[in-house]
């Protein structure tokens, strides 16, 4: 098959080159963006006098027919087409004749692919934001029910201070809030139109790039043509943001694995989102959270792969950047799947408050409250209070009990500076609610945090709905 670029070549491409060079079997995912960009380009060519109104409409009608064929699965993609741009242009010319050959006037595949890929990433950005907001809403719905469910807060995976389960879930939601904010920042920074940049230096046709920008829903055109065709920062931004999402998902998954273990028993995963063992009949394995952890490495790899592709490229287009898409496609697919299944896993899990409370009674979680009591009520310097509290802990351990189980008389017997009323501060409920500063684990503070995050979710959901018309 003759190549659209084959005029100066005497020999046909080898079959091996066609196999090696073709990107059509993965960049065909960009077909909607390619057709959208071509329609806008055709309208712009009419505006600057290259196409007549009749020719413009003929091209647009032809592109719509091709779009219908692709969406119905009737369009055949061939390696000889090289990429989605050539496949659609060849099909258009075969469909409407020589008029189709005019479409590529004042356009290069360099700015064409920069447009298509950017449009795809921006569209995907909105989809991932939507999934994050849905996940946050599910987390917050659970958190609202458990603002008084006491559990052990941990540092170094050791019992530290009592918190409520809702507070722990709010911490998860805060991570995903930052992910949303990061993606929104990416969108604003990258919502610029590269079409009209040509191969690397602009075009001599007087392309109306402002018209293209408005037609395609961008905020503004890119500034420099050479940068426009060589820039893949938007793809790297997406991969970095996806990597951060997966890091946060992986940390949540780690807690789900721990909390569902026999040693914790804080939660039970639904049978719908757990698996069994091929040899041990009693097993119920947390495969979903384990796979969520594992997939984070895959997404990190896609980010590092594209960074390595881009690091040594001279400016303007290089064929190396054909390697930019598969990693992004794969990462988007996997992160989307991870967000959806994590949401369902959380919605269907069973929560065991009694086990959380039982474990909160182990490990002297109210020790800090004893030290604070010594400072506030007994006038003891904090370092001395720390030492005295350590002595009380040692005494409790010698008795085989938690410090909250000691009598007031026993506690006061450890050091003469300990005053009456100390027993009351060792209650887990008191300890949790004593942390009533902004950001603390007290019930009132946890409820406030939930309200703030729910408001954020509502606002961003509304903005997402309003913004769906842009770049779509």
Swiss-Prot record:
The keyword Lyase applies. Disulfide bonds: none annotated. Pathway: Amino-acid biosynthesis; L-arginine biosynthesis; L-arginine from L-ornithine and carbamoyl phosphate: step 3/3. One of its GO terms (biological process) is arginine biosynthetic process via ornithine. SUPFAM superfamilies: L-aspartase-like (SSF48557). It is found in: Cytoplasm. Its EC number is 4.3.2.1. It holds the Pfam family Lyase_1. One of its GO terms (molecular function) is argininosuccinate lyase activity. It comes from the Bacteria. The keyword Lyase applies. Keywords: Amino-acid biosynthesis, Arginine biosynthesis, Cytoplasm, Lyase. GO terms for cellular component: cytosol. It catalyses: 2-(N(omega)-L-arginino)succinate = fumarate + L-arginine. CDD domains: Argininosuccinate_lyase (cd01359). Belongs to the lyase 1 family. Argininosuccinate lyase subfamily. HAMAP family: Arg_succ_lyase. This is Argininosuccinate lyase. It comes from Helicobacter hepaticus (strain ATCC 51449 / 3B1). The gene is argH.
């Amino acid at each position: 098959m003759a190549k659209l670029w084959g005029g100066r070549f005497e020999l046909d491409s080898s079959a091996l080159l066609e196999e090696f060079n073709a990107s059509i079997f993965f960049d065909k995912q960009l077909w909607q963006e390619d057709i959208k960009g071509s329609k806008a380009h055709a309208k712009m060519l009419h505006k600057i006098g290259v196409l007549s109104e009749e020719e413009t409409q003929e091209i647009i009608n032809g592109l719509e027919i091709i779009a219908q064929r692709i969406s119905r699965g009737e369009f055949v993609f061939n390696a000889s087409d090289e990429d989605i741009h050539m496949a659609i242009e060849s099909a258009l010319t075969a469909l409407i004749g020589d008029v189709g050959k005019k479409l590529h006037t004042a356009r290069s595949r360099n700015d064409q692919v920069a447009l298509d890929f950017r449009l795809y990433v921006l569209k995907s950005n909105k989809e991932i934001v939507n999934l994050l907001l849905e996940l946050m809403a599910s987390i917050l719905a659970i958190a609202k029910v458990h603002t008084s469910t006491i559990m052990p807060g941990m540092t170094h995976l050791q019992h530290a201070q009592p918190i409520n389960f809702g507070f722990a879930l709010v911490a998860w939601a805060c991570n995903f809030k930052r992910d949303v904010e990061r993606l929104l920042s990416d969108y604003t920074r990258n919502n610029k139109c590269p079409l009209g940049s040509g191969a690397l230096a602009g075009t001599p046709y007087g392309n109306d790039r402002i018209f293209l920008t408005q037609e395609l829903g961008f905020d503004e055109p890119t500034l420099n043509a050479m940068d426009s065709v060589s820039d893949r920062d938007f793809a790297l931004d997406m991969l970095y943001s996806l990597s951060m999402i997966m890091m946060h998902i992986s940390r949540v998954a780690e807690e789900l694995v721990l909390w569902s273990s026999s040693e914790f028993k804080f939660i039970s995963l639904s049978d719908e989102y757990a698996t069994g063992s091929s040899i041990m009949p009693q097993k119920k394995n947390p495969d979903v959270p384990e796979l969520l952890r594992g997939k984070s490495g895959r997404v990190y790899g896609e980010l590092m792969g594209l960074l390595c592709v881009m690091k040594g490229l001279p400016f303007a287009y290089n064929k190396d950047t054909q390697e930019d898409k598969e990693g992004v496609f794969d990462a988007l697919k996997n992160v989307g799947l991870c967000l959806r299944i994590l949401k369902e896993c959380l919605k269907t899990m069973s929560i065991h408050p009694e086990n959380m409370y039982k474990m909160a009674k182990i490990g002297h979680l109210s020790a800090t409250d004893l030290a604070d009591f010594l400072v506030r009520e007994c006038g003891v310097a904090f370092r001395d209070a720390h030492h005295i509290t350590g002595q009380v802990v040692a005494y409790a351990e010698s008795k085989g009990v938690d410090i909250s189980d000691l009598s007031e008389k026993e506690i006061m017997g450890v050091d003469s500076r300990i005053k009456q009323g100390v027993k009351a501060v060792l209650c887990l409920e008191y300890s949790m609610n004593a942390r009533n500063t902004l950001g603390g684990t007290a019930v009132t503070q946890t409820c406030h945090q939930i309200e703030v995050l729910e408001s954020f979710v509502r606002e961003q959901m509304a903005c997402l709905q309003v913004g769906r018309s842009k770049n779509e």
